[in-house]
Curated annotation (Swiss-Prot):
The gene is guaA. SUPFAM superfamilies: Adenine nucleotide alpha hydrolases-like (SSF52402), Class I glutamine amidotransferase-like (SSF52317), GMP synthetase C-terminal dimerisation domain (SSF54810). Transmembrane segments: none annotated. Its EC number is 6.3.5.2. It comes from Pseudomonas entomophila (strain L48). Keywords: ATP-binding, Glutamine amidotransferase, GMP biosynthesis, Ligase, Nucleotide-binding, Purine biosynthesis. This is GMP synthase [glutamine-hydrolyzing]. The active site is at C86 (nucleophile), H181, E183.
Length: 525
């Protein structure tokens, strides 16, 4: 009998915290399947989900405000372990008969909590032991309200001078609350705390591994698709590449990929995609060379948003044209990943509860009467990368920096021309090549060159040069919501600048972008 890697599962209820997806990723890293749902999930849906344990996440609300979020009653009726984090601890306390009050002293940032209770959750987990034998943890706090009276048979788990009940527990029920955030890396023992809850207290086995996920996904694809044929738009990005490798492993020649070469890709990228999938892996790939069509449609347009729309529409037109030549296609594959699913799934409070498909190929599924196959829809980006490696894709492809859908079209400021794209491609290639040589590529989260449609005077030999300006951009980030400009060594910048100006006829000046996000965005357009 096939292994059910979803059998041991954790339910995470989202109360609006910026860290909620991080909790899910941490639980998955432990090797346990979990799902993230809105706090107002139906009682019946919770019972049907049948979790081994439940995590109540944090949120920005105050429990004593009218209509503030509450955990569904099913959470406490199921008799499974529950971990409340921050707001989750407060609503647990309030709903079970305790008391929560506003605090004059809010806690945001690093804190040290004393572990004062002997619980299963924190037994043997500490960062410090003081002279009196009191255990301490270095944690990350982010709260205003605090629990001032615990419900029922709860005991104090942890405390700080300003928050005497910074944690509470009832080992008999398997209920725990912590006012700090174990899911963020600033809480040093956070991984051990979550592992203790998920594995030891909830009894979940680590079945959620890359090899098991691949086997499970292959089995699901085969069951869904049968002997039918599947179409995939292959971009060369991480998600579509992993989908292609996975589907090829599952159904072989039943898969046909269409790779649209829009003339706005990185240097040699089209050839690399074809070599990887068609020549090395034996995948059926149709290459549509549509550079002229894209550039013709972009001619004269300088507005960034309009450029994006033109590129998107043209992609759909080209993809449609290629797809219409194929016969007997029943399924369209897409690289939808779990964050897409979370974003498009709402709560019942006026938001759509139905998960919408991200139709990155427009209305094609409806027009061609195709059914969707989305083998990555349960996976976070880091998990997609891991199964990419498991499927044999090269590390450099799987861990490549993000590249925008419109490609170089949004890295050429203003109107897009073939001349600009050709210059930019070469400059970008030099920058990335030198980052790799200096071992800086994987220290940066994203790095690229931007073409600026302005000219600057330069000197080459004894002659005057009047040529284009490009900007180097490199950032470090964890989540791409905020980013710091990368502090690259001056020697590296000097090498890159020298090579670009000397090797590319048409560039006279190289600048380095030292803007962080916010206030700037990572991409220029």
């Amino acid at each position: 009998m096939a292994l059910d890697i979803h059998a041991h599962r954790i339910l995470i209820l989202d109360f609006g915290s910026q860290y909620t997806q991080l909790i899910a990723r941490r639980v998955r890293e432990i090797g346990v399947y979990c799902e993230l749902h809105p706090f107002d999930m139906d009682d019946e849906a919770i019972r049907e989900f049948n979790p081994r344990g439940i995590i109540l996440a944090g949120g920005p609300e105050s429990v004593h405000e009218a209509n503030s979020p509450r955990a569904p009653q099913a959470v406490f009726d199921l008799k499974v372990p529950v971990l409340g984090i921050c707001y989750g601890m407060q609503t647990m306390a309030e709903q079970m008969g305790g008391k929560v009050e506003g605090s004059d002293l809010r806690e945001f940032g690093y804190a040290r909590v004393d572990v004062v209770g002997k619980s299963r959750l924190l037994d043997g987990i500490e960062d410090h032991v003081d002279d009196d034998g009191v255990l301490g943890l270095d944690v990350w706090m982010s709260h205003g309200d605090k629990v001032t009276q615990m419900p029922g048979n709860f005991s104090v788990l942890a405390s700080t001078p300003s928050c005497p009940i910074a944690g509470m527990y009832d080992d008999a029920l398997g209920y725990y609350g912590v006012q700090f955030h174990p899911e963020v890396t600033h809480t040093k023992q956070g991984g051990r705390i979550l592992s203790r809850f998920v594995q030891d207290i909830c009894g979940c086995e680590a079945l959620w591994t890359a090899s098991n996920i691949v086997e499970d996904a292959i089995a699901q694809v085969r069951a869904q698709v049968g002997s039918a044929n599947v179409l995939l738009g292959l971009s060369g990005g991480v998600d579509s590449s992993v989908v292609a490798a996975l589907l090829h492993r599952a159904i072989g020649d039943q898969l046909t990929c269409v790779f649209v070469d829009n003339g706005l890709l990185r240097l040699h990228e089209g050839d690399q995609v074809m070599a990887m999938f068609k020549e090395n892996m034996g995948v059926k790939v149709i290459r549509a060379d549509a550079e002229k069509q894209f550039l013709d449609n972009l001619e004269g347009e300088a507005d960034p948003e309009k450029k994006r729309k033109i590129i998107g529409r043209t992609f759909i037109d080209v993809f449609d044209a290629e797809a219409s030549k194929l016969e007997n296609i029943q399924f369209l594959a897409q690289g939808t990943i779990y964050p897409d699913v979370i974003e498009s799934a709402g709560a019942k409070s006026g938001k759509a509860h139905v998960i919408k498909s991200h139709h990155n190929v427009g209305g094609l599924p409806e027009e061609m009467n195709l059914k969707l196959v989305e083998p990555l829809r349960e996976l976070f980006k880091d998990e997609v990368r891991k199964i990419g490696l498991e499927l044999g894709l090269p590390y450099d492809m799987v861990y490549r920096h993000p590249f925008p859908g419109p490609g170089l079209g949004v890295r050429i400021l203003g109107e897009v021309k073939k001349e600009y794209a050709d210059i930019l491609r070469r400059a970008d290639h030099i920058f990335i090549e030198e980052l790799r040589k200096a071992d800086w590529y994987h220290k940066t989260s994203q790095a690229f060159v931007v073409f600026q449609p302005v000219k600057s005077v330069g000197v080459v030999g004894d002659g005057r040069r009047y040529a284009w300006v490009v900007a180097l951009r490199a950032v470090e980030t964890v989540d791409f919501m905020t980013a710091r400009w990368a502090h690259l060594p001056y020697e590296l910048l000097e090498t890159v600048s020298g090579r670009i100006i000397n090797e590319i006829d048409g560039i006279s000046r190289v600048t380095y972008d030292v803007s962080s996000k916010p206030p700037a965005t990572i991409e220029w357009e």
